[in-house]
Structure formats: C-alpha cells, structure tokens
Amino acid sequence: MSSDISNNDHLVLSDNPDHPANLIPSLCAKFWTLGWVTGTGGGCSIRENDLVYIAPSGVQKELMKAADIYVLSLAAQTASLRDRVYLRSPPCYKPSQCTPLFLAAFTKRRAGCCIHTHSQWAVLVTLILEAGGGPGGAEDAREFRINNIEQIKGFGKGFEKSGNLGYHDTLRIPVIENTAHEEDLTEFLEEAMDKYPDTYAVLVRRHGVYVWGDNVHKAKTQCESLDYLFQLAVEMKKMSLPWITDITPVKTRRS
C-alpha cells in the first residue's frame, strides 16, 4: 500500500451531512446499534464518481469520524490486491481488507455504495444451509432462496434492469466459503457476481454478507430488507416452516 505525499484532508472535510466522509461514520453508527459492525468488524464504502471513500480497518465503527476515512481513485487502481494507491490516508489506521471486495461492486456493478455486515442472522442462515437445512437440502448449501414474503419487494430485479422483485418472486443470494484473510474472498465474490448477475448481495459462510446498491439509499434499504429476511428465515426454520412455498396468486376484481 502506498499513499500520496500530501494527506489531502480537503477530500474528507465538509459541513454537508450527506458528504461520503460524513455519511459513512453516520451509517456505521446506526449499523453498530443493529449488531452489524460489532467489535470493529464490517464496514462501508461509498463511490462518488471516481472517488471511493472507505472506512478503515480496526476502528470502532460507532466512534468513527470523517478524519478516519480513506479515499482512493477508482480509475487509478491496478489489478493487484495489495498495491493500492490512496489519495488520502488517515495517519492512525490501516486500510480495510474489505477494499478489493468493495471495489468489485463498484467496477462490476457500477454500485454507488457497498455495505459489509457481520450480522448474526446472515451467519446463522449460512450455517443452516451448511447443515442441509435449505430448500434443496445438502445440495443447496451455496444458495439462499426465499419467496412469497412481502419484504422481497425491497430488492431490484437486477443489474441494469428496471423495477423491483414482486411478492411471489424468488430472491436468490449466493453463498461463498470464508477465507482466513478477507481480501482473499475477492475472487470468489467476483465469481458469484458472474454466476448471479442479478444479485445485490453475496453471503460469506460463517462470516457475514456484502450488499451493494446503485446509491447509498438503495444499498441501505436492501441491506435492511435482507437482514429482515435472514432473521425471518431463521425463525421460520425453528418452526419447520419452508422458505420456498407454492402459493396461488390471489385473484382480485381488477385482475
């Protein structure tokens, strides 16, 4: 990792609460209350045109400040995972190992925001799938599927597609295996994105989830919707209720 000779603090100084350097700490403080970024885990990154703003590694997310944020140019990055060029680096922290995974969402999906959580519900869902508790049993350990739940409407139909999923649609989220070092997940996350071109998220077994969106609003609401569905799925499993059901659409007078 290398950084520019000037610290470029002007990139993170703004009175605008919606500036990425202010928004990331604000979002992470909210995520901390939800248990998504406990113990310095998890993170968030926002892309504004070519500039990418990233929460650092090892910081208590509920205490993070704008001055803690890294900034890089997306166009200036190389294929190497370990040779990042930063426009602005805080003096007291290390770059997040999530960085190449965030960049994958920005380059492959043109996302405006990517959120990484260590949600317990996300982890539990991957464990249920690992134990053969998914709709397809042990053969289905690498995909979370659920349908006929209202909150599914919170997700877009897919990359470069207009509109959202419907109540009767099936939401599919790929699952990849965890690695000892976070940055080593990158190739597997990219493979999952290629295999599931319409997904807005990738689960990491025994670890958490990466969720992205066209902008901060969409990434945040999709992350919230997904966590709701993960919790619901765990509770449904306790009651032996299936995640995939065959429900006949209700006919209305205007149908």
Curated annotation (Swiss-Prot):
Key words of the record: Amino-acid biosynthesis, Cytoplasm, Lyase, Metal-binding, Methionine biosynthesis, Zinc
A molecular function GO annotation: zinc ion binding
Reactions catalysed: 5-(methylsulfanyl)-D-ribulose 1-phosphate = 5-methylsulfanyl-2,3-dioxopentyl phosphate + H2O
EC number: 4.2.1.109
Subcellular location: Cytoplasm
GO CC annotations on file: cytoplasm
Gene3D superfamilies to which the protein is assigned, alphabetical: Class II aldolase/adducin N-terminal domain
Matches recorded under InterPro entries: Aldolase_II/adducin_N, Aldolase_II/adducin_N_sf, MethylthioRu-1-P_deHdtase_MtnB, Salvage_MtnB_euk
Xref: SUPFAM superfamilies: AraD/HMP-PK domain-like (SSF53639)
Domain of life: Eukaryota
Catalytic EC class: lyase
Positions with a binding annotation for Zn(2+): 116, 118, 207
HAMAP family, alphabetized: Salvage_MtnB_euk
Stated name of the protein: Methylthioribulose-1-phosphate dehydratase
Organism: Pyricularia oryzae (strain 70-15 / ATCC MYA-4617 / FGSC 8958)
